[in-house]
Amino acid sequence: MPEAPETKRRDASGRRWDTWDDVQRDPLLRELPFKIETNQHGQVVMSPPPGFPHSLRQPRIARLLEDHLSGGYVVTECPVKTAKGTKGLDVGWFSSERRAKIGDSSQSPVAPEICVEILSPSNTEAEMDEKRALYFEAGAEEVWLCSTEGDMRFLEADGEQTTSQRAPDFPDQIDV
């Protein structure tokens, strides 16, 4: 009887991954100074590390979320499973109910209710449009975008809002 074909994905160097756990365990990937995500084909996609302003805004946004929302969990660098691979969310907020359903998975099978992307100069509008759509498809209620100047945009599936529905007093500018 012939052997079954290999089911794991291979990159150009022949390295293989089948799950996000495989990506996390890969010793070569752990040493790279890049943000790592996967695409819909299971291939690893690397981005340059974020710049200093991004690194300053990320914890500020996380603290502000904790200040403006209670009864949930704020996460940073959260791997979220989407229809087009695992995406690394900059900041997110899970309700206690949603968090309880996730368990101890190495990636979240559902998006947090609030997903925040902090833009870097390397991000394109098309890339952010796609991520926004993927987060909504994965269960996000709101997607927030923080521009390179710190301007906040609050989006729901049906369009942009002037404020967040869950955190209406959240500032529309994140200064650093």
Spans of model-derived segments:
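Gly/Pro/Ser/Thr-rich low-complexity, intrinsically disordered segments predominantly at protein N-termini
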Residues: 1-176
